[in-house]
């Protein structure tokens, strides 16, 4: 079933849903650059105003995956992505990137999908570059990195080249659109398990159900009630969990895991170098809030990766990975491996 762009726009004005096949068609037009900038802007703004449905988001993610440069990973067991939507305005250091090293050190395979900072002071790509990682890898090189080190970073512009067809429109609009929530749904390596942070509480239930439709295995979508797109130490965290095809929504608290509730204010950074310093301090087992929040998030990721039977068990594994020095060693391992591909 096809729909004209004008019909789709009218549908959004009337707050009516664009059906799955129609959304597939529309999204392909956008990704190919077949819509005028005016029409593309009108449609994605209309979707935002009426509020995108689970079906519309799932269809859009399906098309983004179609257009991606895929990373072929041979062994899908214990394979996880740790990612946030960003846009939470918290300006903290790169917690999910730090968690990647801990999660890999504890035995999971991590395919991290990220970009440079837009609303944040330091995106995952920025801090990895500050650490000395070569982020400009081709798909086969990322696959080799995952196989060799247990970690691979997929720099979004290298894996979603069709996004250039909507980039100028998004930049000029300057407001959140459906594309702000598609990134975490479109991992080019197809990681079946995921820890996903979101910038709004309503997205917890939406994103986990989108992942359910997309056939994911074990996913935890989280929103810290202090506004963080991470599992928070400063407040309760809302969780939407997909496991065995079923969705459960609940809250967790730092105290549930023997952790103290503390403010996240000390985690703020101004740039990638400050983020690098805080990340390395946490991985060097320096006591403090940074180490504890990395332990909490890595523990949750280890549960998502099915390495741990619970978040509590995952936290214990994360503590051991940091205390043993294995997590810190993973940084040097990734730097060494990726630098061989420097162009």
UniProtKB/Swiss-Prot annotation:
Ligand binding (Mg(2+) 2): 229-230
EC main group: transferase
Entry-linked InterPro entries: Anthranilate_Pribosyl_Tfrase, Glycosyl_Trfase_fam3, Glycosyl_Trfase_fam3_N_dom, Glycosyl_Trfase_fam3_N_dom_sf, Nuc_phospho_transferase
Source domain of life: Bacteria
One Pfam short name: Glycos_trans_3N
Residues the entry annotates as binding Mg(2+) 1: 96, 230
Example GO BP: L-tryptophan biosynthetic process
Residues the entry annotates as binding 5-phospho-alpha-D-ribose 1-diphosphate: 84, 87-88, 92, 94-97, 112-120, 124
Protein's UniProt keywords contain Repeat: no
Known pathway: Amino-acid biosynthesis; L-tryptophan biosynthesis; L-tryptophan from chorismate: step 2/5
Keywords: Amino-acid biosynthesis, Aromatic amino acid biosynthesis, Glycosyltransferase, Magnesium, Metal-binding, Transferase, Tryptophan biosynthesis
UniProt-listed NCBIfam families: trpD
UniProt function note: Catalyzes the transfer of the phosphoribosyl group of 5-phosphorylribose-1-pyrophosphate (PRPP) to anthranilate to yield N-(5'-phosphoribosyl)-anthranilate (PRA).
Similarity section: Belongs to the anthranilate phosphoribosyltransferase family.
Stated name of the protein: Anthranilate phosphoribosyltransferase
């Amino acid at each position: 079933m096809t729909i004209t762009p004008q019909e789709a726009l009218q549908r959004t004005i009337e707050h009516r849903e664009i059906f799955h096949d129609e959304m597939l068609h529309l999204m392909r037009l956008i990704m190919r650059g077949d819509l005028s900038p005016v029409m593309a802007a009108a449609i994605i703004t209309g979707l935002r105003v009426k509020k995108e449905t689970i079906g519309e988001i799932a269809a859009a993610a399906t098309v983004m995956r179609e257009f991606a440069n895929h990373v072929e990973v041979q062994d899908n067991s214990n394979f996880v992505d740790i990612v946030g939507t960003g846009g939470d305005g918290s300006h903290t250091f790169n917690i999910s990137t730090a968690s990647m090293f801990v999660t890999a050190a504890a035995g999971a395979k991590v395919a991290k999908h990220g970009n440079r900072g837009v609303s944040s002071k330091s995106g995952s790509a920025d801090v990895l570059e500050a650490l000395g990682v070569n982020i400009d890898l081709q798909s086969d090189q990322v696959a080799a990195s995952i196989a060799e080190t247990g970690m691979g970073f997929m720099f979004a512009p290298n894996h979603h080249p069709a996004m250039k067809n909507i980039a100028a429109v998004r930049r000029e609009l300057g407001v959140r659109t459906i594309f702000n929530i598609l990134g975490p749904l479109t991992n080019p390596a197809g990681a079946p398990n995921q820890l996903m942070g979101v910038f709004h509480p309503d997205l917890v239930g939406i994103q986990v159900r989108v992942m359910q439709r997309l056939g994911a295995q074990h996913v935890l979508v989280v929103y810290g009630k202090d506004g963080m797109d991470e599992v928070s130490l400063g407040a309760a965290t809302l969780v939407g969990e997909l496991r065995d095809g079923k969705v459960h929504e609940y809250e967790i608290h730092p105290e549930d895991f023997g952790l103290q509730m503390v403010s996240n204010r000390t985690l703020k950074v101004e740039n990638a170098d400050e983020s690098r310093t805080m990340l390395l301090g946490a991985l060097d087992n320096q006591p403090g809030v940074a180490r504890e929040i990395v332990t909490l998030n890595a523990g949750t990721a280890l549960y998502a990766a099915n390495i741990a039977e619970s978040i509590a068990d995952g936290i214990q594994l994360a503590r051991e990975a940091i205390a043993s020095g294995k997590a810190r060693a993973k940084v040097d391992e990734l730097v060494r491996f990726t630098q061989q591909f420097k162009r």
